[in-house]
Amino acid sequence: MIRTGQAFPSVKTSWLPIPNSIRYSALIPGIMGMMLLWPFGDTAKKVTMMPAKEVPGAQGTVAVKTGKNGNTEVDVTTKALAQPSALTPPEETYVVWFQPPDQSPKNMGALRVDNSLNGKLSTVAPYRHFKVFITAEKQQNVASPHGAKVLTADVLG
């Protein structure tokens, strides 16, 4: 018969046969190593771009993260984006623009679309909050957007 409240000396209260102080101190180096290797704050925030009616099947994402120097690292990725020459009217290239609040758009570079209709542009910017949009242009070094916006997004860092 078992009495309640009585201790059983043959039953161990711990699953490890070592004292608690040794067991917990052995965990500290492992926890510290995980903290150094874990990518805290290194993951990118992703924003989905909205397609224009001219390219309804196009998809785009903007991935942003803060770099080591405090600037914003930006990766613009597109899928199923038609070649600019297939648009009406046909154009030569796509240009990615960043527009901070109360400022004019800045040309961040040409977005090249491959034969699989995928595109990517990686760049760095000093902005936290800005609009991202892609236009079809006659040339890549234009100072201001002239072509139609094909994908747009708002980045609120």
Map each language-model feature to its residues.
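Short, low-complexity intrinsically disordered segments
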Residues: T13, S21, L36-W38, V95
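Bacterial N-terminal signal peptides that target proteins for export
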Residues: T4-P29
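Bacterial N-terminal signal peptides
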Residues: I28-L37
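N-terminal targeting/export leaders
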Residues: W38-G157
